[in-house]
Amino acid sequence: MSRICQITGKKRMIGNNRSHALNATKRKFLINIQYHRFWIADEKRFIKLRVSTNGMRYIDKKGIETVIRKINMKK
């Protein structure tokens, strides 16, 4: 399964490891993805999402119902 946040759409970035001699080798910068269950009070059930920690902070700020409505409007 791809490491993409279901809320923010963030995914990995590609960059370089740089040695002391400034040799460059390719590497991936992975985002901090977590499985998290959120309680939806209106429906009286849990929903399980793969979200980045930044996405969790966004949900804490806006509320899960608002975020879910916003995602469904995009689709």
UniProtKB/Swiss-Prot annotation:
Keywords: Ribonucleoprotein, Ribosomal protein. Signal peptide: none annotated. The keyword Ribonucleoprotein applies. It comes from the Bacteria. One of its GO terms (cellular component) is cytosolic large ribosomal subunit. InterPro entries: Ribosomal_bL28, Ribosomal_bL28/bL31-like_sf, Ribosomal_bL28_bact-type, Ribosomal_bL28_sf. HAMAP family: Ribosomal_bL28. Belongs to the bacterial ribosomal protein bL28 family. NCBIfam families: L28 (TIGR00009). This is Large ribosomal subunit protein bL28.
